[in-house]
Amino acid sequence: MESITSIEMYVADRNAEWLGVPRLVLMENAGAAVARNVLRKFPTAKRILVVCGTGDNGGDGYVAARHLHAAGRTVRVIALGEPREELARINYQAVTRLWGVEVKAAQLPLELLALQDWFMWAEVIVDAVLGTGIRGVLREPHATAIELMNISPAPKVAVDVPSGLDPDTGEVRDKAVRAALTVTFHKAKRGLLAPGAQRYVGELVVEPIGIPPEAELVVGPGDFAYLNFTRRADSKKGDHGRVLVIGGSLEYSGAPVYVALAALRAGVDLAVIAAPEPAAYAAKAISPDIIAIPLEGPRLSTKHVDKLASLAERFNVVAMGPGLGVEEETQEAVRELFRRLAGKRAMVIDADALKALRGVRASGAVVYTPHAGEFKALTGAEPPQSLSERMAVVREQAAALGGVILLKGRYDVISDGVRVKVNMTGTPAMTVGGTGDVLTGLVAAFLTKTSDPLEAAAVAAFVNGLAGEDAAAELGFHITASDLIERLPRVIRRYAFESIR
């Protein structure tokens, strides 16, 4: 049986909406599925109690109550507080307008105990209290609600996950509803299949609710949930990411600047460029926000490796490649530095550095960001035109390299050798030079906010494309990489903080 973690389910739910399937429709389908299974398993039961929490699980319960009432059952609902989610609130209001459904609020344990006769009255109890929303030790009124449900002789039907059961591990830290039937949605939550969970789960039914398979494949707003954008009140400089950019040469000084500025706009505290002298001095002149450390000479060479390896110890992430050039001494320096840092620092490899690392296997968190030509230089493989074939090739080559590949294109394809994601944001206006450097800076920044390099790369591609779309909507096709950088904070703010739950 296919399974999914709670965060993967959250992501799929949000991304389904991004693809055009409203979450209100998903909630309606979920609640209707619960009601349908209650009627199937307990066809003679007439009196049904639905206990609803304050989140989306409670919203599913309100929908189920409405459908059970429509099927001719006598339904009572206990609301454990005002719904805190808008969709749950809509369905709460809908069920309270039904004359035939009795709804009572019970936010305190004493208020629940006063309704103990309702628990004994029921022939079936629907548990819509927590679902996948459990976090740590049970709080009130949830603990009392679970206890009263378990005391009742009526069989329990759990909505998505029995309340109190960890959806990812199947562990029960305190107490959990002992269900005769669990109706879960889209895919089985991993904890439902864990050894020892069966006595709480009972019969397990997986119901489709309209989430398309693309919701798990396509990058969307839900993927922000993998990144941590929160900040403690007592945060200090450096707590939120330090990125070292190794790039630039006599001929190319702008590329590392784009990387560093994008990383700063994506929320890192410190972005430092280590570049050959001409590029370092140019970077200092371009922006006062950037610290630039000059490396002796016109281009990177092996004589700089010791200094750079030592410098990298002060940073979370190293981004290497933009503007370095392809001279043999530079390519050799890239290979040596890559080997020195492998497994010790997260790395983003882009542009000229990609050409130096063909056949060099990665260890640790490494993200490669090639376009089609660089992909061939890195792997020896030609990326196919067909999206499905391209996905297969990127996954195969990522597995061979031991890192994450973000293959840029009309649709960006991202894989760690096992999982594959596709980013659909972007615009033809982004063919202008420098947008790939902005992407490198975003990947570097997001590697400081998650331990999952695939998701760091996926969200970076998503944000980069949205920034390009925003710039093109305002300016047409005549945009620059600087226009993207300017819009990054607004794009990130639009989606990041909805994911903090």
Swiss-Prot record:
Region (NADPHX 1): 56-60, 131-137
Listed EC numbers: 4.2.1.136, 5.1.99.6
Domain YjeF N-terminal: 9-217
Binding-site residues for K(+), renumbered to this chain: 57, 127, 163
Region described as NADPHX 2: 371-377
Catalytic activity: (6S)-NADHX + ADP = AMP + phosphate + NADH + H(+); (6S)-NADPHX + ADP = AMP + phosphate + NADPH + H(+); (6R)-NADHX = (6S)-NADHX; (6R)-NADPHX = (6S)-NADPHX
Named cofactor requirement(s): K(+)
Any coiled-coil regions, as ranges: none
Binding residues for (6S)-NADPHX 2: 323, 437
Keyword tags: ATP-binding, Isomerase, Lyase, Metal-binding, Multifunctional enzyme, NAD, NADP, Nucleotide-binding, Potassium
Free-text comment on the cofactor: Binds 1 potassium ion per subunit.
NAD as UniProt keyword: yes
UniProt record, GO biological process: metabolite repair; nicotinamide nucleotide metabolic process
Positions that bind (6S)-NADPHX 1: 160
GO MF, one example: ATP binding
Binding site for ADP: 408-412, 427-436
Domain of life: Archaea
Domain YjeF C-terminal: 220-495
Region (ADP-dependent (S)-NAD(P)H-hydrate dehydratase): 221-501
Region NAD(P)H-hydrate epimerase: start-end pairs: 1-221
Record's function text: Bifunctional enzyme that catalyzes the epimerization of the S- and R-forms of NAD(P)HX and the dehydration of the S-form of NAD(P)HX at the expense of ADP, which is converted to AMP. This allows the repair of both epimers of NAD(P)HX, a damaged form of NAD(P)H that is a result of enzymatic or heat-dependent hydration.
Homology family: In the N-terminal section; belongs to the NnrE/AIBP family. In the C-terminal section; belongs to the NnrD/CARKD family.
Protein's name according to its UniProt entry: Bifunctional NAD(P)H-hydrate repair enzyme Nnr
Organism listed in the record: Pyrobaculum aerophilum (strain ATCC 51768 / DSM 7523 / JCM 9630 / CIP 104966 / NBRC 100827 / IM2)
